[in-house]
Amino acid sequence: MNLFTEIRTLVTAELGAMTEAGDLPAGLDLSAVAVEPPRDPAHGDMSTNAAMVLAKPSGKPPRAIAEALATRLAADPRISSAEVAGPGFLNLRLRPAVWQGMVATILKAGDTYGRSTIGAGQKVNVEFVSANPTGPMHVGHVRGAVVGDALARLLAYAGWNVTREYYINDGGAQVDVLARSAFERYREAHGLEPEIREGLYPGDYLIPVGEALKAKYGDSLLDKGEQHWLTEVREFATEMMMQMIREDLAALGVEMDVYSSEKALYGTGKIEAALDRLKEMDLIYEGVLEPPKGKTPEDWEPREQTLFRSTAHGDDVDRPVKKSDGSWTYFAPDIAYHYDKVTRGFDQLIDIFGADHGGYVKRMKAAVAALSAGRVPLDIKLIQLVKLWKNGEPFKMSKRAGTYVTLRDVVEQVGTDVTRFVMLTRKNDATLDFDFDKVLEQSKENPVFYVQYANARINSVLRKAREQGMDVSDATLATADLDRLDHPAEIALIAKLAEWPRLVEIAARTNEPHRVAFYLHELASELHGLWNRGNDEAGLRFLQEDPVVSQAKIALARAVGVVICAGLGILGVTPVEEMR
């Protein structure tokens, strides 16, 4: 149950009544009418912009609309007051019984409280990580993996049919570099000195690949030229790298539904089919692009190329898809891959890219808009850098990887749950500081601990209540005398719980799972605040001598626990029942 949706329904119903009474003209568009928490809680429990958005189309002063609407709303038994503020904003206060009833609603709904159907079963493809299969996942991949997986969980929670997908970049030159690097480790496995030339991958992670190559091929490749072993070693090493990446993802609690190969697009006609589709729309032509200002991109050349007219769909310049020598640009297989997604019947596409792919956003959106005739929206989320710190200094590289901190480095130091939560404590497009010391601190400043400690405190209340012989099942707690929850701090905590269904829908519509982490921190803060006040005010403690009062307060604590566990589930974090 979304209380904000319920009150918005009341507001629109009263606006309809005003229309019938002749106070408003017929045919007004009410889609922009919103009911939200006010910016300042002192102004009320909810606020609506109805009068402000209807003033111009109705030709009436906003304050006059607000005053008439306030009179009608104040007559509803759920509303204790409706006050006009400023030029026409309307602030509402709800009766305590509405808030108290929310506790029973949450306990009866259990883990379905907050779940939404706004996705309406639409098929959404979330492509994320898609790291080159050339080594173990690094910390930058970790953030993208967590954001993508949490987003997929969020969308499923809100009613979408979600497919998690990994695009294997196995068609470019980097996998040839991988093969050459692995071959040097193969030579090393035979007792020869590896020649890790500049440009090759130096990490120790390729040593097992070399040993595996030796086990499979013996010394049969040692005396052969590159042209005889490159293809076999490339495929062998790529598969071993993908197995390593799958294990890395599993360590992070991420499971993909689909792995798609870039290499599979070549030689199958899929690239040609996608470009033929664009050609049918007169979006492919032969031409010479003006030289770009500043840094020259890899796909620019001062000769005639095959170009995609991406400017027809919002891009800044048209983009090359085939070079003058007849080879494809990097963009061509990406177009084909996204066309494949469109033809698989997805209603929505989401790509999670590293921040260094920012220049790709407009061209990729243009391609999808053209290939889907505007039917399939593409949202691209850019993941900013993660800065690692330990002992007050930047965290050093991993010897195993050779050049960077790996996913395993992070997870082995702090655990999967801490890693996942911390990666969602900032919006995806903001740089994130990950301090190995601070994320393990048991302090208010550590958001992971703060939220988990709230859940642990709730479970301690439930344990003590059981020890006293109380029935603390959700069904029994839902029948508690909830009007005993009348302190402003208790009402404020319930009001925060009431925001959960609305928060879920906003986060899902904007594809922003970090909002869930932010909300959980706010909810934990309300719970801890009430708990700490109980240290000074005995009447606010969750366990009371009066069993009727105690049951009501335990019901509130349990309702908070329901929402915390639901939120942590979306983040892919296991709730802690007891702090150790």
Curated annotation (Swiss-Prot):
Keywords: Aminoacyl-tRNA synthetase, ATP-binding, Cytoplasm, Ligase, Nucleotide-binding, Protein biosynthesis
One Gene Ontology term, aspect cellular component: cytoplasm
Any GO MF annotation of the entry: ATP binding
Example GO BP: arginyl-tRNA aminoacylation
Subcellular location(s) of the protein: Cytoplasm
EC code: 6.1.1.19
Motif ('HIGH' region) on chain: 131-141
InterPro entries: aa-tRNA-synth_I_CS, Arg-tRNA-ligase, Arg-tRNA-synth_N, Arg-tRNA-synth_N_sf, ArgRS_core, DALR_anticod-bd, Rossmann-like_a/b/a_fold, tRNAsynth_Ia_anticodon-bd
A Pfam match: Arg_tRNA_synt_N
Residue ranges the record marks as coiled coil: none
Family: Belongs to the class-I aminoacyl-tRNA synthetase family.
Quaternary structure, from the entry: Monomer.
Descriptive protein name: Arginine--tRNA ligase
Organism: Cereibacter sphaeroides (strain KD131 / KCTC 12085) (Rhodobacter sphaeroides)
Gene this protein is translated from: argS
